[in-house]
């Protein structure tokens, strides 16, 4: 079979990173729960409710920081010239949600819309962070689920919120995520009681609270919360380097997008036991993707991810001697003409797309506030 394809832009270039840290491995699955039918959530409007929580202040050396927002001295001392600088406040998390909204509305070509509400109150939980942390190298997320339960009970009992107006729920918590394989990176894990970032689904909660669990009751039991994304305020931490401490700069932008991708039904596309890359930097649901550019600029979802979410209708190759123009996907000109499906067997196929970082050749100007 001969296939003639005119590539309007010939280079196929993976996203690269400035000063990309080496051997960054995400050390656990993103999702706790089965994948939901993608069509039910991946198209149309998702209404997001997000809250900010901190913990009882502590001096526990097994966690990073003091358990409260503003408790990471190494960030406070570096000013605003780093990724995800202080203050981590209402404005900071609003910008995170704006990034999430823009990312999905752009990469879906408008098929996915997000409307969000961030409550302005910082809610303080009843225990120090370490008491909500799962045991190290364990899949027992009971303590973390209890933190989620306490959070929504606290919000429901102290704030007038109509929870029925929302579909997806996010908890932004103080501190650093327990998401990097620090043993592989540095040879030791200095903060084993930090909290892992996780997307809880209903059946994940049911594994913990029982098969009859139908969500956390709120609004006098008239509404139930059946999902929650647990996201840290930052992934940046100090590690020991030659000559002293070194700041490992990692933003949560990519992690937030990947966690929302998990909510939409996308599977993890990396080895969740070892953290090793699966699809690399050409997609969202791989650590090399959502930690691309130090986590600040995740790549667009891969061709398969867009197809799985119902965002793409590829042109399927049916005959021989076929001539196609394949525009760069990132131009977002005609998304349904930017993906070709080539059947191999009844169950296997190739997806062909043209990926370009700078298809117009004009470069990008970034203004960082």
Residue ranges of each PLM-predicted region?
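Zymogen propeptides/activation segments of proteases
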Residues: 3-7, 16-211, 336, 341-369
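Extracellular hydrolytic enzyme modules, especially secreted metalloproteases
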Residues: 168-170, 174-368
């Amino acid at each position: 079979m001969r296939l003639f394809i005119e590539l309007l832009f010939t280079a196929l270039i993976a996203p690269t990173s400035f000063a990309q840290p080496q051997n960054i491995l995400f050390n656990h699955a993103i999702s706790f729960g089965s994948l939901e039918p993608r069509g039910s959530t991946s198209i149309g409007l998702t209404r997001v409710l997000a809250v900010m929580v901190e913990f009882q202040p502590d001096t526990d050396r097994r966690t990073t920081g003091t358990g409260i927002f503003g408790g990471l001295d190494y960030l406070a001392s570096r000013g605003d010239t780093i990724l995800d600088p202080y203050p981590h406040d209402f404005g900071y998390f609003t910008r995170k949600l704006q990034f999430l909204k823009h990312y999905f509305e752009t990469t879906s070509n408008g098929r996915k819309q997000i409307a969000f509400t961030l409550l302005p109150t910082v809610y303080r939980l009843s225990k120090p962070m370490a008491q909500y942390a799962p045991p190290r190298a364990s899949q027992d997320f009971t303590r973390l689920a209890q933190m989620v339960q306490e959070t929504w009970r606290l919000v429901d009992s102290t704030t007038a919120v109509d929870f029925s107006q929302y579909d997806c729920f996010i908890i932004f918590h103080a501190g650093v995520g327990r998401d990097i394989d620090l043993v592989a990176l540095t040879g030791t894990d200095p903060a084993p009681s930090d909290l892992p970032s996780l997307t809880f689904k209903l059946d994940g909660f049911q594994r913990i609270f029982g098969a009859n669990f139908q969500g956390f009751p709120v609004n006098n039991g008239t509404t139930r919360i059946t999902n929650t994304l647990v996201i840290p305020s930052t992934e940046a931490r100090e590690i020991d380097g030659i000559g002293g401490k070194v700041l490992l700069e990692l933003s949560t932008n990519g992690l937030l997008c990947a966690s929302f991708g998990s909510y939409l039904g996308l599977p993890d596309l990396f080895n969740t036991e070892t953290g090793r890359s699966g699809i690399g930097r050409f997609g969202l649901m791989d650590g090399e993707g959502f930690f691309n550019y130090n986590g600040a600029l995740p790549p667009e979802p891969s061709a398969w991810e867009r197809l799985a979410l119902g965002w793409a209708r590829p042109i399927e190759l049916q005959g021989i001697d076929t001539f196609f123009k394949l525009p760069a996907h990132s131009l977002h000109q005609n998304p349904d003409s930017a993906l070709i499906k080539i059947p191999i067997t009844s169950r296997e196929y190739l997806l062909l797309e043209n990926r370009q970082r700078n298809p117009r050749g004009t470069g990008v100007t970034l203004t960082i506030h």
